[in-house]
């Protein structure tokens, strides 16, 4: 066979018949996922849901809503955080084109189409999609709902700290520091503006330096808030909060808040939303137990949940330098805090804390790290909520896929194959060692002069092999 050579410039064919178009066997994970969606009647359901938001019988037909949501699912399963990356991946892969249902003769949707559709469809449609997936879990007995864990994390916003401006005057950071230097008499009004090095030196020397959300905002994304990230750096960010079923690891609610909201401010709202989602998914179970970390502990929150809800809290108390003083607080507050302390320090409370730490942190690892949601490329809290809800729905679909087909992600199929090969190899080695042992034992029986020591030595060598 002669060696083929790649041509630097190739003349493309003017016309290609259908039988010459490239074919793909498809990815088994996405074929199975399409099977699950088809069995649930996803496309007809989502088209009926989105129909009121389109013109009736006028204009060019849009991209089907099922294709839009599938592309967002691809973003989670492939770990792609940007819409440009999703559009490129879908156009580049024959198996993903098959998953989306796009014929080979048609172009895949552009990234701008995702923006248009997202802006057209309200948050309620994305929320309905999340609940539809929860209903699938409910039908497969993958929701328990009685005991939940709550935790939060920060998402980096699509806005830079360099772009923030003063709310009162509209000055950016350089203009603000220049004015302070003029007021301090370090420079005159008619002097040339100081360079960046002089501004940084002056900024470090200030004792009352403060960057507050009350005074500063981002013109790029006014909904983003200044917050400290998990790695200790300061960024404009959002806050994501998960309510996780501790029985199955399913996400019951995935809420996005402003980053300056404290955990104690959002706990009750997230629990209520999780209960609403459970009911709309067809579950009759009510949330009874809620476990969270010490960041969610406050006297007011514990008391509010005890007196006005049915949730039983398991929230550890933060360490205090001094004992709590109850003389200036109502007795019901003391009773609520002591009851929560007693439950949390018990055997069941410690078990729930271990489960919460394992399962809720795992959902953030899947959605934010491998799912690509740690850094958002969208502006506005409404847009961030829409995209994050679909990422959480994709996580729940992964749980369903793992339950049905033993693979929760496209990469999980390869891991399953490796695990299966490892099990087969282990059984083969065990069988080989056992065979050698019985053979050596038979030889020692037929030749009494052989000692038991030699038999044991041969067996040891067989096990090592």
Please state what every model-predicted region is.
Residues 47-49, 94, 110:
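An anion-engaging/catalytic patch
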Residues 81-91, 102-465:
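Anion-binding and metal-coordination hotspots
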